[in-house]
Amino acid sequence: MVKKIEAQGYLERFLQTQMAGLTGHMKEAGYPYDSVEWGMPDVPPPIKGQTVWWRYEQTAYWTDGYVRCAILLGDEKHIENAKRIIYNVINHPIGTYLGPEIIRECEPGEEGACRWAHVVFFRACMAMYEYTKDEAIPKAMVAHYLNDTADYGKMRNVLNVEILLWLYGITKNEELLKLAQTSYDRFNLNAKQDACDTVALSPKKPHEHAVTYNEYSKLGALLYEATGKEEYLKASISAFDKANRMFMLPGGCVCSDEYLESNHYYHSIETCNITDMTWSLAYLLRITKNPKYGDWIERCIFNGGMGAVTEDFRALQYFSCANQIISDGQSNHNDYVKGSGWMQYAPNPGTACCPGNVNRFMPNYVSNLWGVEEDRVYCYTFGASTFRCEIGGRSVTVKEITDYPVVEQVTFEIETEAPFTLYYRYPSFMSNCRVTVNGKRIPKGKKSVFNGIAIEKSCRVTLSFESEVVAHTKKDQIYFTKGALTYSLGMIGERIPEYEEGKTFPKYRMYADQPWNYGIVSAEAAYTPVEGFEGFDLTKPLPYLTVRGIKISNYRLQTLYRFKMCVEPKSYKMRDVVGKHVFTPRLVSPKRAKTEGEIESLRLYPYGAAKLRMTVFTKLCEACLTKEKGKA
């Protein structure tokens, strides 16, 4: 699908910025990106204590994002470099095995994960095949799988089921389907972790590595697509419904401060999961045609995704949180590796997976905007783009003009030689939808299905959505959304750049440069739209909400000199840390809050534009404040 979609508007500008940032200059992130590449004949030995496949997993993340970004931009220079990387592997098998020779044999203790890096790299091969239609790519991949002796019935090797089923869809080779089914079924028969069908279909709250959970939970839907067996699909649907219900955070992604923990606002999103969750949900959206998955994808990309990277795409966070008003080399307030720099904006802020995986989330989003099945064209999620396809051998072009989700209107300019049906979502977070064809109003659709418009000839279709500001309250907490966007009290902050030797992309120490210690006194909010949206950047025009708040004098940065840090999230093994650290504090309860000054009007901007931000606030009682002042 990549070749048929051209990014435009804000999405194109973002991809251009991405390529000018880390995606096109990945060596700035350091090891392993500065010395290891798939298809490279000579690489340094692995770092002592590190699994052999680990560095190839990270560089494969980058490769996939890089390939897709280059193709979507039509950047010939980078497309040629992407081809070089892919064909260095495809054209140089070891027998039939594809990939680095050093990970051909599974090292002791890694028999269940030694082929995980291949899943990541083969996604880049999938993108290149979709662009070139070169049959040499799937042919080499099929030979690799059907002659490999690795055990695909173990975690994370079982994730190769995704690639096996993609190959089956192209070749219809029954051996691939059999390998996918037997591997998946054998894994579930012996699974000892919470990423499995038994837990997905049970009431149990899963405690699982979030990346593993997001990657695994799509496989059932893919097997359903290949086999028609409903039991496979039920597991995937249940797994993601459970994650949405138990772990969803204000930034639109599940809690993933390494493991799934809860939906408490103080938990963070690991940036890898912005990519992995939305990649998996795109499969479910396409297979089930349930629009809710599109809603979830948009919330995640335009809040959590935008909020985890700097405006120039030269730095990212490993952990990103709804509330973060300090970001430096010691500010990670999550229990896991607490006091580390994993919440700092840097080219490589923690371990190397996120610097690679961050390159994938927007290219994946754009490449999954559109789909076509027979004479049905689906706009799965919204974004400025041009989609081209053929129906019955005749050309169809749909140009989507929009600044969605900042501006809630989408126009499709359609040029077609063939009749078809255009299907669109009516997002659940919209309160109204006005649909016109060539200016003539037609009935709006439903939120629970994809809605079809019969297109007989070239025309112009406009979707004009309306959304309401929603105040989300939980106990004594409150935050605000409108449409797909979450809103935050955001600030650029004082940014102090720091450069590592030989690098030109800095990491930042960021500190609040304006008051942030407010409680909210009313659930009412006024919306001000934007004219001339340019991007998620506080220095540029943005929509905002105006809310009423008051300062809380005893709500301050948290300074600790001794605390517990989790060093193993599965068992929650802890150790002591000694030394001064400053953290974003938890909210003060209304009973403990000491207010000062007068009630103020506060502007909340899109979460994704705010790198330092307060999103979730203490909810105060305005009448109680007035009563207290009367007593004074």
Report each predicted region and the residues it spans.
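Aromatic (Trp/Tyr) and acidic
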Residues: M1-E76, P108-Y131, V158-E175, L179, ...
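C-terminal beta-rich recognition modules with glycine/proline-rich loops and embedded aromatic residues
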Residues: L15, S236, D295-N303, A308-V410, ...
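Helix-terminus loop motifs that line ligand-binding clefts
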Residues: E28, S35, E76-C114, V119, ...
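Glycine-rich, acidic and aromatic/proline-enriched surface loops and short helix-turn segments
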Residues: N88-N91, F121, A127, R186, ...
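Solenoid-like repeat scaffolds
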Residues: T149-D151
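C-terminal beta-strand-rich structural cap/linker in extracellular carbohydrate-active enzymes
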Residues: F420-Y423, N451-H472
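Solvent-exposed beta-strand/loop surfaces of large extracellular or lumenal domains
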Residues: M430-G452, V469-K475
